[in-house]
Amino acid sequence: MTILPKKKPPPSSDPEGNGERSGSGAPDSHSRSGARPRSSPPPRWAYPGNPSSAAERHTQQVSPPPGSATSGGAGPLGDGAPASSSSSSSSSCNGAGAGGCCSGPGHSKRRRQVLSAGPGATGNCPDTDDGAGNNSEDEYETAAQTQHLDPDTAQQQEHWFEKALCEKKGFIIKQMKEDGACLFRAVADQVYGDQDMHEVVRKHCMDYLMKNADYFSNYVTEDFTTYINRKRKNNCHGNHIEMQAMAEMYNRPVEVYQYGTEPINTFHGIQQNEDEPIRVSYHRNIHYNSVVNPNKATIGVGLGLPSFKPGHAEQSLMKSAIRTSEESWIEQQMLEDKKRATDWEATNEAIEEQVARESYLQWLRDQEKQARQPRKASATCSSATAAACSGLEEWSGRSPRQRSTAGSPEQPDVHAELCMKPPSPGAALTLGKPPSPCAPGPSNQMSAGADRATSPLVSLYPALECRAIMQHMSPTAFGLKDWDDDEILASVLAASQQEYLDTMKKSTLRRESSPDHS
């Protein structure tokens, strides 16, 4: 069963009793079936009354009892920004009675009346459209003050307000876009963390007002459906009625700050809890901004999420981001290590291939050198053999003793020259077996040179040294009386070989001095 609110007596029956009717016909005495009890109706803003508007009276007035809002500051404050009006009505002027001021918080329009001269003047006054479209009467006085405020003074006041909130409370004012939806943007910023979700907040608020129309309609003088349809527009300003609805909807108190460190008004929800309130700041009596506490997370509080902890999502996201970053970094490092290992292997392969190529080229050069050297050696041996044959005729007339004494002076020179010119290290590495001194014939030397075509640099130093030593030794050391003809041939061959060695050394020095083009 629904208990309807009490009807108010017509204005004509008690023209000066609006103040009394405000207390006797308070809307908080109205109750609804199945609804939760309300501690107070939507509060109205406290402001010093204007003498010109104190005598005004609006028809069909419904005023909440005074003192229903928690006020924490002094000074004039408007409850909303101007909004478009969808209905109009005529008002009559009454020069007496301060209680005739229409102070209801839900008035969607207001007609300012011009009083005639004299405090007791009465009569009909023409209506003006100066205040048309405002949500309540307390916007008129503050709006007039704002228009005459110096811009520099207003800027200093805004700066002081932000600095005071930051130093004393640690709060930060977040600027909202000034497009008529600033109140819903401020609430969306603190509930959803994104002011662009103001349309969702507005839709939920209007739906909540429609579901509780039997309560909130008592504070709206115009048709409640028309009021809701107008408030659904994105460019329509919000008011304290919407603040009360959002405080109940999100079950979070709504605190309003205006140029002070303490809230001038607080809207409470149905149930008291320890949730962080929704804080908004009111600027120039026309704009709302969001006031946030950077040290305490409040996003998501009031949405009815089970087991929701403010800030836990950010921590989880941070941990997930750190874990993902570490995994990505580890994978990147492993990939780089593999790339470096691959480069190292490829480098080793390239080095090995280059070394093998250079070694092969060096081997080819050595083969070419070895192929050219046998021809030079055979030519030298043939010239040495011819010289030896011509020298045999001269030595044939001599006795062995004379030949030995004649040939002996030459041997020290050979031995000394051999000692002065030692063999090169490269030739020592390729030494073969020295030829036997017992068979020193020219034919044997030629055949031996032909057989060693692949290795022509056979060192003859051991054989020459042996022959030189044998020339200095006495024949009696070997059990002989005198040297035979073989000894003469051996000495001739030794001289030929010495000549060949000198030629080879000169050619080697010539090749070393000139660049190797092969």
UniProtKB/Swiss-Prot annotation:
Entry protein name: OTU domain-containing protein 5-B
Family: Belongs to the peptidase C85 family.
Protein EC: 3.4.19.12
OTU domain mapped to chain residues: 171-294
Organism: Xenopus laevis (African clawed frog)
Active site: 179, 182, 287
Compositionally biased region (Low complexity): 79-95
Transmembrane segments: none
Catalytic activity: Thiol-dependent hydrolysis of ester, thioester, amide, peptide and isopeptide bonds formed by the C-terminal Gly of ubiquitin (a 76-residue protein attached to proteins as an intracellular targeting signal)
Pfam families the UniProt entry points to: OTU (PF02338)
Assigned keywords, A-Z: Hydrolase, Protease, Thiol protease, Ubl conjugation pathway
GO biological process, one term: response to lipopolysaccharide
